[in-house]
Design a protein with these regions (language model features):
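Cytoplasmic helix-loop-helix junction between adjacent transmembrane helices
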Residues: 112-144
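Helix-breaking motifs and short loop linkers at transmembrane-helix boundaries and internal kinks
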Residues: 47-49, 81, 102-108, 119
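Residue-level signature of mid-helix packing/kink "hotspots" within the transmembrane helices
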Residues: 35, 62-71, 121
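Paired small-residue
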Residues: 92-99, 107-116
Length: 144
């Protein structure tokens, strides 16, 4: 199954529901990854020998990544099929978070959190367009 660039390609209800579920799982992962670090700050600070305010810079780095990545990645991926772009964005997000989990230094923590934030905004924007394009016009708001 592929998602066409042309809006309005209505999928059968079952296929649309599966695609929406997959995108919802991706959105849940991004939301969890964004906020989970706040609860882990004391552990991260202790493991890296940092203060909690220093670890707070990793949260800011993620937000900066979201701000930079949303327009940049949406533009760079404009020629790709949206389905492929969503998969690439989730891959980048997963790699950034995996690297964050094993980071040994403060600098790499901040850098990997920035990388993890890059796909966030573009993913939500593209997923909303895909979700609304898979269903009939009267169901678009609910799909998003």
């Amino acid at each position: 199954m592929s998602i066409h660039q042309t809006p309005g390609h209505v999928l059968p209800a079952r296929s649309a529901a599966k695609m929406e579920a997959a995108m919802a799982v991706g959105a849940f992962a991004i939301g969890t990854g964004e906020f989970a670090i706040m609860g882990l700050m004391p552990d991260i600070a202790q493991n890296l020998g940092l203060s909690e305010p220093q670890v707070g810079h990793a949260i800011s780095a993620y937000a900066l990544g979201v701000m930079v990545g949303a327009p940049l990645l949406a533009i760079l991926g404009a020629k790709l099929l949206r389905k492929h772009m969503l998969l690439l964005l989730m891959g980048l997000y997963a790699l950034g978070n995996l690297a964050t989990a094993f980071t040994p230094t403060f600098g790499s923590l901040v850098a990997f959190r920035f990388i993890s934030g890059l796909p966030h905004g573009a993913y939500f924007g593209i997923a909303a367009v895909v979700a609304s394009s898979m269903v009939p016009n009267d169901k678009r708001a609910g799909a998003v």
